[in-house]
């Protein structure tokens, strides 16, 4: 992708946020790349196997941008009105990647897969959360040869949420992904709205091997008001 980097701490359209998952997965497989403007909130590749005869899902970032929402990436540990965290299983460690903003928390087991990536965005401008949740799984469904295992739109710790799990093809490999987005609201009087996204990715043929670690991360994922 042709690169265009935005200031790391400025407010930016959510497209910059949502595609970081794709960049992170691509970078793990292929080495550093320069992200473009759209490339930080989408979990799907730029091409997909969705038939043109069916209605193509609209990605979350595209919906949010269409209603004028912008997002400011913030470090999970810097939040004063929310607790957002994931555990680090034994053998996992923080992973640095030039394609990922410093405010993104990423851990991995070894130098490749599996990985877990946690992102938080402070959202600006009001929007319909129920409508946004309809687009919460679109990026995954647009992935090449995506096969869904399960999904849910049940609340997470009392906050609106969407989850999807499945497998897809990327750079000649079959990957397994678990992805949850949460729209928490901070404490009054500000009642700041956020987008939290956790994406866990492994090689599909190693998903069982790493299942206990992945389940521990999912079980220990916290999004809670302080």
Curated annotation (Swiss-Prot):
It comes from the Bacteria. Keywords: Cell membrane, Lipoprotein, Membrane, Palmitate, Signal. Its main location: membrane. A lipid is attached at residue 30 (N-palmitoyl cysteine). PROSITE patterns: PROKAR_LIPOPROTEIN (PS51257). GO terms for cellular component: peptidoglycan-based cell wall; plasma membrane. The keyword Iron does not apply. A lipid is attached at residue 30 (S-diacylglycerol cysteine). It is a lipid-anchor. Gene3D superfamilies: Mog1/PsbP, alpha/beta/alpha sandwich (3.40.1000.10). InterPro entries: Lipoprotein_LpqN/LpqT-like. It is found in: Cell membrane. Residues 1-29 form the signal peptide. This is Putative lipoprotein LpqT. It comes from Mycobacterium tuberculosis (strain ATCC 25618 / H37Rv).
């Amino acid at each position: 992708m042709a690169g265009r980097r935005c200031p790391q701490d400025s407010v930016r359209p959510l497209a910059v946020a949502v595609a970081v998952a794709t960049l992170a997965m691509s970078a793990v497989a292929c080495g550093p790349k320069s992200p473009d403007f759209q490339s930080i909130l989408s979990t799907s590749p730029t091409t997909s196997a969705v038939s043109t005869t069916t209605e193509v899902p609209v990605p979350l970032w595209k919906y949010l941008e269409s209603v004028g929402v912008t997002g400011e990436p913030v470090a999970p540990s810097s939040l004063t009105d929310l607790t957002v965290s994931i555990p680090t299983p034994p053998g996992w460690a923080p992973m640095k990647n030039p394609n990922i903003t410093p405010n993104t928390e990423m851990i991995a087991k070894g130098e490749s897969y599996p990985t877990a990536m946690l992102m938080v965005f402070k959202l600006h401008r009001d929007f319909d959360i129920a409508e946004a949740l309809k687009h919460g799984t679109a990026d995954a469904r647009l992935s090449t040869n995506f096969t869904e295992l399960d999904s849910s739109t049940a609340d997470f710790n009392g906050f609106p949420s969407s989850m999807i799990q499945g497998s897809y093809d990327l750079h000649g490999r079959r990957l397994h992904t678990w992805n949850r987005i949460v729209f928490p609201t901070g404490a009054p009087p500000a009642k700041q709205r956020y987008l939290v996204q956790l994406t866990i990715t492994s090689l599909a043929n190693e998903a069982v091997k790493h299942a206990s670690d992945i389940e521990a991360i999912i079980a220990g994922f916290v999004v809670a008001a302080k």
